[in-house]
């Protein structure tokens, strides 16, 4: 089966999209979904050097390894090779509107992901929880037939 990649996009690839990537990877591993991967990038990430320390703290608290993470600039090739590109806001999606595989979190999860940059750790923690809930909706929308459910043997594709 061909591997499918979900790419998460925010502005600088230091706060929201790395949290979304890490939380998504954790969720697909927990649900035993195979042949799906995650990535993240920023629309304006040219000068980004590392993940925001508060975003890192949120991932660490959730037991998510981000040690190999490095912020990167979004490139056309990444969009073209992704199964789905999910932007944190409608405005970010509008910048990429010429691609058919680009969505906003609002379209999938019912709300945008607010930017916690420069705020208290508690705001980052709340953002991480909003992302976790959105990730569940993303998986349910795009991969609902690919993970086993309790007491539902035979009701999913292998």
Where are each of the predicted segments found?
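Conserved active-site segments centered on acidic
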Residues: 1-80, 140-158
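Phosphate-binding/catalytic loops
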Residues: 84, 88-158
């Amino acid at each position: 089966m061909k591997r499918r990649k979900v790419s998460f996009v925010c502005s600088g690839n230091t706060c929201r999209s790395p949290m979304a990537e890490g939380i998504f990877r954790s969720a697909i591993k927990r649900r035993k979904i195979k042949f799906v991967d995650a990535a993240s990038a920023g629309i304006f990430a040219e000068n980004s050097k590392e993940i925001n320390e508060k975003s890192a703290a949120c991932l660490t608290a959730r037991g998510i390894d981000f040690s190999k993470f490095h912020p990167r600039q979004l490139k056309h090739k990444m969009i073209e090779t992704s199964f789905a590109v999910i932007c944190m806001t409608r405005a970010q999606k509008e910048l990429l509107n010429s691609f058919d595989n680009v969505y906003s979190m609002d379209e999938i999860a019912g709300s945008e992901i607010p930017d916690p940059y420069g705020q208290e750790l508690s705001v980052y923690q709340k953002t991480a929880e909003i992302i976790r809930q959105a990730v569940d909706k993303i998986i349910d929308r795009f991969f609902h037939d690919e993970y086993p459910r309790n007491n539902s043997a035979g009701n999913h594709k292998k």
